[in-house]
Regions:
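Short Gly/Ser/Thr- and Asp/Glu-enriched loop/turn motifs at secondary-structure junctions
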Residues: 138-143, 174-176
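Conserved short beta-strand edge segments in small beta-sheet-based binding/regulatory domains
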Residues: 168-182
Length: 191
């Protein structure tokens, strides 16, 4: 049984593309540039590498404005990040302090730190109830891969999905955490 949160992200990328008026292919690159703290010029180049520097800065500003308008609460989050970045650290969802060296990186550190913490909690919960002779094979980014006897695969796949939800609940998140489990004999079968 295997699967991560990838399909959830794919759907969200399409939703963002539709809201902002860019293609699905562009939105993933642009979204990550935005979340990782790119300035307007870099954001514009993420949209189209062939733009002039001035045109990229203008396009980047348009994209930034569209994102902020399209995603409820984003403006407030960015303002809170700007204020909190002045102290030099972010408070992780598990209470740890994450050092932030530059203000424009604050949101990225907060998101990456939170995602890693949730994914690790997910792994811990899953491993508490492994099927007989079940083994974890890998943990890559937001994906857990396990092996087990075929007779346990369906039940274990359901447990993987439940454990993702429980990981989010562990941190009292307001947005649900979801995962989709897939069953196959090889890594390629589940991708």
């Amino acid at each position: 049984a295997s699967r991560g949160l990838g399909d959830v992200y794919k759907r969200q990328h399409q939703t963002n593309a539709d809201r902002i008026g860019i293609t699905r292919r562009q939105v993933k690159t642009v979204t990550y540039a935005f979340l990782y703290g790119a300035g307007n010029t870099k954001l514009g180049y993420s949209y189209d590498k062939l733009l002039s520097e001035k045109a990229a800065a203008v396009k980047g500003a348009e994209i930034r404005k569209a994102y902020i308008a399209a995603i409820p609460g984003l403006a407030d989050l960015l303002l809170a990040c700007e204020k909190a970045s002045k102290r030099g650290y972010a408070n992780a969802i598990d209470g740890r302090r994450i050092s932030v060296d530059k203000g424009h990186k604050f949101l990225n550190y907060l998101l990456q730190g939170s995602a890693a913490t949730i994914a690790k909690r997910w792994m811990v919960i899953v491993n508490e109830c492994l099927p007989p002779d079940g083994h974890q094979l890998s943990f890559v980014h937001d994906e857990l891969n396990y092996e087990c006897y075929p007779r346990f695969a369906e039940e274990f796949a359901k447990w993987l999905e439940t454990a993702a939800r429980l990981a989010g609940e562990h941190y009292n998140l307001r947005c649900p955490i979801a995962a989709e489990a897939k069953i196959g004999y090889t890594w390629a079968d589940v991708h």
